[in-house]
């Protein structure tokens, strides 16, 4: 079964499209899900469940469109700021299994908050900085493998 966002991309379900490019697309969420006027979802056009599965090139195109949408929100709606929200993978509260970024317009004193009011209960015994630095030393290799895997899935 196809994911809901892939169905939108294939025009099986109507959407309020803001932009459709070769590698990324942007649309408004359903009115009942909108967090603010102009709240926009930006997705890669090639299915990736989350950020871990997306190819570097797909992610770059998606983020370039996120920036264009952010500029349009500022210029057209007068929102001086935006929040970028994304959830990816188990435990993240990801609502649709297709990588997506919420671009939420923000105005001073809009009454909206995005920061959690409490810290995570999860603990890591070792130094998170050291663990992440070690993982990053091999991240380029993993990223290349992930991109190659995504390229194979497209062909």
Labelled PLM ranges:
Residues 1-155:
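HIT superfamily nucleotide-processing domains
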């Amino acid at each position: 079964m196809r994911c809901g966002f892939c169905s939108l991309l294939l025009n099986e379900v109507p959407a309020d499209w803001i932009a459709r490019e070769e590698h990324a697309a942007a649309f408004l969420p359903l009115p009942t899900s909108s967090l603010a006027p102009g709240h926009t979802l930006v997705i890669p056009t090639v299915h990736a469940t989350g950020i871990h599965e997306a190819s570097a090139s797909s992610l770059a195109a998606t983020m370039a469109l996120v920036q264009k949408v952010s500029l349009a929100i500022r210029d057209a709606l007068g929102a001086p700021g935006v929040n970028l929200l994304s959830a990816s993978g188990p435990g993240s509260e990801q609502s649709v299994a297709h990588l997506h970024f919420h671009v939420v317009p923000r105005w001073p004193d809009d009454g909206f908050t995005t920061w959690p009011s409490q810290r995570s209960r999860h603990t890591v015994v070792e130094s998170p900085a050291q663990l992440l630095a070690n993982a990053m030393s091999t991240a380029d290799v993993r990223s290349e493998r992930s991109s190659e895997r995504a390229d194979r899935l497209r062909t």
